[in-house]
Amino acid sequence: MFKLVATDMDGTFLDANGTYDKKRLQKVLAGFKEKGILFVAASGRSLLALEDLFSDFRDQMAFVAENGSALVVDGDLTFEEHLTKEQYLEITQLLTSSPYMNGHDYLLSGKNGAYVHQDASDDYVTFISNYYENVQRVPSFEEVDDVIFKLTANFTAETVREGEKWVTERLSYANAVTTGFQSIDVILNTVTKRTGLEALCEQLHIKQEEVLAFGDNLNDYEMLEFAGTAIATDNARDEIKAISQEVIGPCEDASVMTYMEEMLDDKKRNSDYCY
């Protein structure tokens, strides 16, 4: 029997506009509550952005945010891993010097807000504000007074994998991971979405085989490996499909929502759901 259902957001649960059907989710969460199943949003998005995205349901779910760096259960931050100031300042200097970067088009994701350099392009700030809350321009990252979970940077579709490798090769304590939208997140190399999900399972005494997870991109890989049942969307990368027990429809068809609804439908339920 599943006790926890975790899903990635962009490219998995959300459509191309970053939205979902709230009425359908409300019904799913009511059904999950009856069956003792916890719904978890697991994303590279910031904690602030996730809590805003699910503002109507915050007390009915858990959040694995910042690619596993922050875990919120029952409204409380119960687990976090963050960069030191020395570390994130070094990473900003590295990104600025990268041949794959466009100037200062990168962001620091913190507990209280998100921070971009005052020289970041307007186009980048407009784009990134769709995924982060309280985006602030600062003249120097030295002035940032916040807990920083990760950095995120955008590349072109042609250079994102090269940029990811270039950054990772130059840091001993952090990795760059592709997250979709031609972007990378730079996080501590001890942290993945699995880290946050595993911490959640330990806190709630949930076994791996009781976990169902959905994903599409490489930053979902470890989470799907951890889950007892892994499911990829049709638009997922081949590496993700290869480790999944099932491939469902694309995110544009709200396939994850449909799957969860069918989990609660006695007529459509099959032995895979194990109730």
Provide a role label for each language-model segment:
Residues Q60-E66, E81, T126-S129, N175-A176, ...:
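Short hydrophobic/aromatic-enriched beta-strand-loop microsegments
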Residues G36-V40, D59-M61, F149-K150, E209-E210, ...:
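Short active-site oxyanion
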Residues L94, M101-F214, D220-E222, N235:
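Conserved acidic, metal-coordinating active-site core of Asp-based
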Residues A16-T19, V40-A41, S129, N189-T190, ...:
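Short, flexible loop segments at the rims of nucleotide/cofactor-binding pockets, characterized by
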Residues M1-L4, K22, D185-Y275:
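Mg2+-dependent phosphoryl-transfer enzymes with acidic/Ser/Thr/Gly-rich catalytic loops
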Residues Y20-D122:
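Active-site phosphate-binding/coordination module
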Residues K3-G18:
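Asp-based phosphoryl-transfer active-site loop
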Residues F57-D59, N67, R170-S172, F226-A227, ...:
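Short, structured coil segments at secondary-structure junctions
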